[in-house]
């Protein structure tokens, strides 16, 4: 069933997202993360500078799973002065694809969300599961 969904999935960075799982390509292997195990999807941008002049930006997309593991969904590098926002686009695509199947997944990063997941992981998992069960 999953192999039939791959051609219609969302491809970005180094993963393919389908309505039932996210497949992450890692060093000659494929990690399959079921949608029911996804708690939080967020991005991180690291800026590289030389003599205080921006040289590049590293955009990394992360996924926090039910087991507490944080998985990188891939990285894109842009120029230091680039206005591109590949993370926003990738997160929006994932949200559009996954929302009908699992409404409780948290998207985007804020310190408040990070503190909530770090301080009460079991409660955060219950919250995501409860919101996913809502009609």
Positions of the model-derived regions?
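Anionic N-terminal interaction surfaces
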Residues: 1-19
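Glutamate identity and glutamate-enriched acidic tracts
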Residues: 4-5, 11, 26, 89, ...
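Glycine-centered tight beta-turn/hairpin loop motif at sheet-sheet or coil-to-beta transitions
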Residues: 10-12, 27-28, 64-70
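Phosphoinositide-binding peripheral membrane targeting modules
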Residues: 14-56
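Acidic, Ser/Thr- and proline-rich intrinsically disordered linker/docking segments
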Residues: 40-134
């Amino acid at each position: 069933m999953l192999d039939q969904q791959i051609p219609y999935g969302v491809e970005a960075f180094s993963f393919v997202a389908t309505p039932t799982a996210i497949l992450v390509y890692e060093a000659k292997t494929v990690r399959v993360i079921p949608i029911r195990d996804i708690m939080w999807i967020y991005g991180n941008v690291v800026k590289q500078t030389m003599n205080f002049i921006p040289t590049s930006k590293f955009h990394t997309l992360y996924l926090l799973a039910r087991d507490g593991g944080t998985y990188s969904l891939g990285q894109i590098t842009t120029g230091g002065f680039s206005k591109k926002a590949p993370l926003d686009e990738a997160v929006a695509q994932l949200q559009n694809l996954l929302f009908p199947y699992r409404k409780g997944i948290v998207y985007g990063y804020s310190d408040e969300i990070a503190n909530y997941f770090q301080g009460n992981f079991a409660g955060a998992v219950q919250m995501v599961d409860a919101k996913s069960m809502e009609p």
